[in-house]
Amino acid sequence: MAQLSLQHIQKIYDNQVHVVKDFNLEIADKEFIVFVGPSGCGKSTTLRMIAGLEEISGGDLLIDGKRMNDVPAKARNIAMVFQNYALYPHMTVYDNMAFGLKMQKIAKEVIDERVNWAAQILGLREYLKRKPGALSGGQRQRVALGRAIVREAGVFLMDEPLSNLDAKLRVQMRAEISKLHQKLNTTMIYVTHDQTEAMTMATRIVIMKDGIVQQVGAPKTVYNQPANMFVAGFIGSPAMNFIRGTIDGDKFVTETLKLTIPEEKLAVLKTQESLHKPIVMGMRPEDIHPDAQEENNISAKISVVELTGAEFMLYTTVGGHELVVRAGALNDYHAGENITIHFDMTKCHFFDAETEIAIR
């Protein structure tokens, strides 16, 4: 088991490209941390610096209180699973899982015990004598996980391990990795560009953009209390709707909208001196309802209808604004149809239009 401390971590390449900027994070023992962000945000580079595969340009990496910057990768007690399974095609599943242990000259009976234990956890016992070519993509990924598990490392690092799998297998493997974390009870750091993976697996999420940490928090926290517009738009599918406007009395107004703001949210706007400058209102698709209430209703025209099974995603035009509305599947909706939508203003978010930081 392991605690990690990343203190002012920097990564600058020889061409002066600054990939990771002042990265700070404390990771407790047994946490499941997910680094998430768009391509090129620095998440995989940060993971590789933890693993010892990339040199740290500045700052300190501590594992269990020991500075690891100059410690070689093989001495960090870390196991890593990559996007590509990197299995030896000529070896059996057993030999692939045992290979690293054999290189460490660990006793054969210990190797046998660990491999069989990992195979039992991962449901691979019946495949131990097969070669990777005879396995499905999900099974090959489990072998790669097994190869990491048998090392009994203090930290497990996973770099987009599910991105080569189809959608159904990704869902299945998400659950398997979460169960694996519970069984092993060890520290895991996982990199993905998929916010759904981050939301469903992490104890805490680290959202990155352009090498900078935007927010760190539990999935529910970053979803309900995003630090800025980037986080609000990145976490959640479909993304949060954004509308630019101003405050007029107790109303959020645009050229075509006038919505009443609840007193508690209006008080925050007053405290933060946001009443007389442009702001951005954010609304999750599930907080805009296709039915009329006493106030905060407006007519919308449906442009696209997506049925996901249990619900509809309605892509609508509202007074020049493009908004996504999440609706139950009890009613039918059609492109070109006009509907009345209701804004649940108790759930709205406000952001500074200039800095894009949440107003709280």
Curated annotation (Swiss-Prot):
InterPro entries: AAA+_ATPase, ABC_transporter-like_ATP-bd, ABC_transporter-like_CS, ABC_transpr_MalK-like, ABC_transpr_MalK/UgpC-like, Mo/tungstate-bd_C_term_dom, NA-bd_OB-fold, OB_MalK-like. The keyword Transport applies. Disulfide bonds: none annotated. Belongs to the ABC transporter superfamily. This is Uncharacterized ABC transporter ATP-binding protein YcjV. GO terms for biological process: carbohydrate transport. GO terms for molecular function: ABC-type transporter activity; ATP binding; ATP hydrolysis activity. It comes from the Bacteria. Residues 4-235 form the ABC transporter domain. SUPFAM superfamilies: MOP-like, P-loop containing nucleoside triphosphate hydrolases. GO terms for cellular component: ATP-binding cassette (ABC) transporter complex, substrate-binding subunit-containing. SMART domains: AAA. It comes from Escherichia coli O157:H7. Keywords: ATP-binding, Nucleotide-binding, Transport. It holds the Pfam family TOBE. The lineage of its organism: Bacteria, Pseudomonadati, Pseudomonadota, Gammaproteobacteria, Enterobacterales. ATP binds at G37, P38, S39, G40, C41, G42, K43, S44.
